[in-house]
């Protein structure tokens, strides 16, 4: 009796699944799709049997899939002598990598130091300092531009004063020359 109810529950679940997949109309044409796929496969087989090149390609596809398999190299048996030659050829590289690995292992305790663990705190402080530095750079640029403007004004003023003093000097020289000429005439 329990087996019958299990079968009925399974049947109900399958019907619900079919409604989800195929919609409320039921399994419309599920056999037609399968039949269509079989027909396509038979048609491809007939076409392939008529053409020699296609037959050869179908045979080569299997080989290609086999060669593209990443485990294919693992299946090929490499003699121990060849493996030894590979290892001996890379001996210096392996030794240098071992030395580097030993250095890394020696430096591992440094990674557990309080300085490294405090990096997040320092990063936040560094970010704030970087922002302050950028603001100060902007202020420095503004001050530099203002200083340049003031120096240009100073240079213009100095140049005008210099020209004015030269003109006054020339005028004074002319007046002194005219004054010296008058007493000589009397």
Swiss-Prot record:
Record flagged with keyword GTP-binding: no
Main location: cytoplasm
Any Gene Ontology CC annotation: kinetochore
Source superkingdom: Eukaryota
Record flagged with keyword Heme: no
Transmembrane feature ranges: none
SS bonds (residue pairs): none
Pfam families from the UniProt entry: Dynactin_p22 (PF07426)
Chain positions with N-acetylalanine modification: 2
Record keywords: Acetylation, Cell cycle, Cell division, Centromere, Chromosome, Coiled coil, Cytoplasm, Cytoskeleton, Kinetochore, Mitosis
Record-level GO BP terms: cytoskeleton-dependent cytokinesis
Localization (cell): Cytoplasm; Cytoplasm, Cytoskeleton, Microtubule organizing center, Centrosome; Chromosome, Centromere, Kinetochore; Cytoplasm, Cytoskeleton, Spindle
Function: Part of the dynactin complex that activates the molecular motor dynein for ultra-processive transport along microtubules. Together with dynein is involved in spindle assembly and cytokinesis.
Subunit structure: Subunit of dynactin, a multiprotein complex part of a tripartite complex with dynein and a adapter, such as BICDL1, BICD2 or HOOK3. The dynactin complex is built around ACTR1A/ACTB filament and consists of an actin-related filament composed of a shoulder domain, a pointed end and a barbed end. Its length is defined by its flexible shoulder domain. The soulder is composed of 2 DCTN1 subunits, 4 DCTN2 and 2 DCTN3. The 4 DCNT2 (via N-terminus) bind the ACTR1A filament and act as molecular rulers to determine the length. The pointed end is important for binding dynein-dynactin cargo adapters.
Family (UniProt): Belongs to the dynactin subunit 3 family.
Protein name in UniProt: Dynactin subunit 3
Species annotation: Sus scrofa
Gene from which this protein is expressed: DCTN3
